[in-house]
A protein has these predicted regions:
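Conserved RNase H-like, two-metal-ion catalytic cores of nucleic-acid enzymes
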Residues: 1-63
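Acidic active-site catalytic centers that drive phospho-/nucleotidyl reactions
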Residues: 8-10, 105, 168
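A short secondary-structure junction signal
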Residues: 18, 76-77, 129, 145-146, ...
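Conserved DEDDh/DEDDy metal-dependent 3′-5′ exonuclease domain
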Residues: 38-129
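Acidic, Mg2+-coordinating catalytic module of metal-dependent nucleases/exonucleases
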Residues: 133-197
Length: 198
């Protein structure tokens, strides 16, 4: 049986308080990461002190599913700025070579199915939030907003961040299962058929 996992990350610092904003994935920090393991049917939780173990877990997996993991979660986990990650320079080139063949990023697949280049964000790519896609496709809604997670973390409400992250991970797992079985998501009221691989 292949080692398939689902990963979701919550950050320590808000985008607004971080110089460089969304591009500064190297400065956001891992507050909590949750990994659902299909083989064990268990959720594993990683904190800021467990980042190296989290990296090793991802590199050991055969398939990694998630939502916007390629452009966000992975660079945050490895502490690499988004521009460096996207350019594939330095350390990121080796990491990307290891992760790319096993990466099942649902958001990238949605963008590709719409004819967008998933590595170049443009205005038309909006409207594909996890809450909207999961709500329309599998009837699952998020229990909060990702922008709140770093605020909770800074307030010391770590269990609240864990609960939120674990819930997102379960939604991403269930959405992955649906896509693997049926091959599409509901996006803007219509079936959107996804490519097998991004």
């Amino acid at each position: 049986m292949s080692d398939h996992i689902v990963v979701d990350v919550e950050i320590q610092r808000t985008i607004e308080e971080t110089p460089g904003g969304w591009d500064a994935t190297d400065k956001l920090g891992v507050a909590v990461a949750c990994v659902w393991e299909y083989n064990t049917q268990r959720m594993r939780v990683y904190g800021p002190d467990d980042v190296q173990a989290l990296r090793e877990r991802l590199l050991a997996a055969d398939r990694i599913s998630g939502y916007n993991i390629w452009n966000f979660d992975f660079p945050v986990i490895w502490g690499i700025s988004k521009p460096t990650w996207m350019n594939g320079s330095g350390e990121s080139a080796v990491i990307k070579m290891d992760l790319q063949p096993k990466c099942n990023d649902i958001l990238r697949r949605i963008w590709i199915a719409q004819g967008f280049n998933p590595d170049v964000f443009s205005k038309g790519m909006g409207g594909a939030k996890l809450d909207d896609i999961a709500g329309a496709t599998i009837g699952a809604r998020k229990i909060g907003n990702g922008a709140d997670a770093p605020v909770w973390y800074q307030q010391g409400l770590v269990q609240k961040v864990v609960n939120y992250c674990a819930d997102d991970t379960c939604i991403e797992r269930d959405l992955t299962d649906f896509i693997d079985r049926y091959g599409y998501v509901i996006h803007q009221g219509k079936q959107l058929w996804l490519t097998k691989k991004d």
